[in-house]
């Protein structure tokens, strides 16, 4: 039995509230169970130096957690004077995941930066960030297209992410913190709405896991991503 009482293939409740902030070109608050992430998209009519005069756009991301997003207060990284390795890893993951679903020629020579700020963490913050980031990006692109700044839709597919793992020997979908902290295997799957794989991150916390177990986790991930894509569609329609 899972601590939450969910079935092995059952997601936590998912909600996406769009237009959560006033100034960003796109924004949403995504909730996956008790995990909540604010995602905002900011459009700039410039690109990094390595892309100047190429005609290509850029999508990047930054990630952070509020000090009391977790059970005990974490020090602000700004106060520490540097980002942790975990933060850098996650924000790079978010950026490259989103770019996998973007036609950068159609985007034009502009940059969209997605900020993902974890308000409350209960497992799966990187997956919630990716899923919510796509919604914020979708809303920002819609605004650019409505203004006539972009003619062809640069978003080629939905992008969403979910965690799966082996908890008490059972493959389970969408781990919360209680499960993640005790899981024998933990994996994150980033996928497109059409079922393409963008990134798979998996590790054994104890004994190695089998290829069959990985296949089972991937099957669960497909179920979860389909549900998340449906939530994205509902939020942006």
Curated annotation (Swiss-Prot):
What enzyme class is recorded for this protein?
Answer: transferase
Q: Which reaction does it catalyse?
A: tRNA(n+1) + phosphate = tRNA(n) + a ribonucleoside 5'-diphosphate
- Function description: Phosphorolytic 3'-5' exoribonuclease that plays an important role in tRNA 3'-end maturation. Removes nucleotide residues following the 3'-CCA terminus of tRNAs; can also add nucleotides to the ends of RNA molecules by using nucleoside diphosphates as substrates, but this may not be physiologically important. Probably plays a role in initiation of 16S rRNA degradation (leading to ribosome degradation) during starvation.
Binding partners and assembly: Homohexameric ring arranged as a trimer of dimers.
The cross-references to CDD domains, in alphabetical order and at most eight, read: RNase_PH_bact (cd11362)
Q: In the record, which residues are listed under signal peptide?
A: none
Q: What is its EC number?
A: 2.7.7.56
Any one of the GO BP annotations = rRNA catabolic process
Q: Which NCBIfam families match?
A: RNasePH
Q: Does the keyword Nucleotidyltransferase apply?
A: yes
Q: What is this protein called?
A: Ribonuclease PH
Give the gene name: rph
- UniProtKB keywords: Nucleotidyltransferase, RNA-binding, rRNA processing, Transferase, tRNA processing, tRNA-binding
Quote one Gene Ontology molecular function term: tRNA binding
Q: Which PANTHER family match?
A: EXOSOME COMPLEX COMPONENT, EXOSOME COMPLEX COMPONENT RRP41
Query: Which SUPFAM superfamilies does UniProt cross-reference here?
Result: Ribonuclease PH domain 2-like, Ribosomal protein S5 domain 2-like
Check the record and name the InterPro entries matching this protein.
ExoRNase_PH_dom1 (IPR001247), ExoRNase_PH_dom2 (IPR015847), ExoRNase_PH_dom2_sf (IPR036345), PNPase/RNase_PH_dom_sf (IPR027408), Ribosomal_Su5_D2-typ_SF (IPR020568), RNase_PH (IPR050080), RNase_PH_bac-type (IPR002381), RNase_PH_CS (IPR018336)
Q: Which domain of life is it from?
A: Bacteria
Similarity comment: Belongs to the RNase PH family.
- Binding residues for phosphate, per the UniProt record? 86, 124-126
* Membrane-spanning segments: none
